[in-house]
């Protein structure tokens, strides 16, 4: 993504010009009029920290270079009490986790037992992120390939996410559905309709600004998804490198 375009998009988000507060059911039409100003905090994925340091020193490093939080894969392999201790000693937040089973065992899989495995995994992630003091679990809703037709994936993914509603209500945590290169939910209109079909205030979209550049424009998705966006991922991406 060109730096200028990214800055413009980020500025639009920061001023709250397109994202309204996440306060009402998604079936309600949302105004694009400016609302309250939003403050964006910066975090990074734990796997991005390549330095050979102790857990606490990794947290300190992240703090020293100006980030606010760290995102872990979940279910988490590190004991939660160690993460909480490092959080409390450094002030680094643990606002969200990425479920690590949604790709290898998709919520859209034709096999009901595979879907149930990841439903249970996401339920555990919701409990973990609550204990860590966060509020969101990133979930890829489905995968389409030569063995899983689009319509089958859509039906199964929708059914699976709906089965997670009792878990988000029990924990009070959010699920953010993310756009990845999974051949599934390829337009902002479809993403909006998918979220609206679930129609739950704790289930929204974890929008990846970089991923979408493969087949779209971030500003289109931001405008269409609006208050359905719960968190953002950003990365460097070059259409020139992709095409060449």
Language model: regions and residue ranges:
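Bacterial c-di-GMP phosphodiesterase catalytic domain signature
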Residues: 220-223
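Histidine- and/or cysteine-centered catalytic micro-motif in compact active-site loops
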Residues: 180, 210, 218, 235-237
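Short, intrinsically disordered, charge-balanced linker/junction segments flanking boundaries
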Residues: 240-244
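Active-site acidic/histidine proton-transfer and metal-coordination neighborhood
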Residues: 10-12, 16-22, 34-36, 108-207, ...
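N-terminal pre-domain/capping segments
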Residues: 2-130, 200, 204, 214, ...
């Amino acid at each position: 993504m060109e730096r200028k375009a990214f800055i413009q998009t980020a500025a639009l988000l920061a001023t709250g010009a397109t994202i309204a507060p996440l306060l009402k059911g998604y079936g309600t039409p949302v105004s694009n009029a400016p609302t309250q100003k939003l403050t964006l905090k910066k975090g990074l994925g734990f796997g991005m920290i390549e330095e050979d340091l102790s857990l606490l020193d990794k947290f300190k490093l992240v703090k020293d270079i100006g980030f606010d939080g760290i995102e872990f894969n979940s279910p988490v392999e590190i004991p939660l009490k160690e993460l909480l201790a490092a959080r409390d000693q450094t002030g680094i937040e643990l606002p969200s986790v990425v479920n690590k089973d949604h790709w290898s065992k998709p919520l859209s899989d034709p096999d009901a037992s595979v879907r149930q495995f990841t439903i249970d995994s996401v339920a555990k992630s919701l409990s973990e992120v609550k204990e860590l003091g966060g509020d969101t679990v990133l979930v890829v809703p489905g995968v389409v390939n030569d063995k899983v037709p689009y319509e089958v994936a859509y039906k199964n993914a929708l059914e699976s996410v709906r089965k997670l509603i009792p878990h988000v209500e029990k924990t009070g945590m959010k699920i953010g559905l993310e756009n990845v290169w999974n051949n599934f939910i390829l337009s902002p209109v479809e993403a909006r309709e998918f979220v609206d079909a679930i129609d739950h205030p704790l289930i929204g979209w974890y929008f990846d600004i970089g991923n979408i550049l493969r087949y779209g424009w971030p500003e289109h998705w931001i405008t269409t998804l609006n208050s359905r966006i719960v968190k953002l991922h950003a990365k460097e991406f070059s259409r020139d490198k992709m095409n060449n």
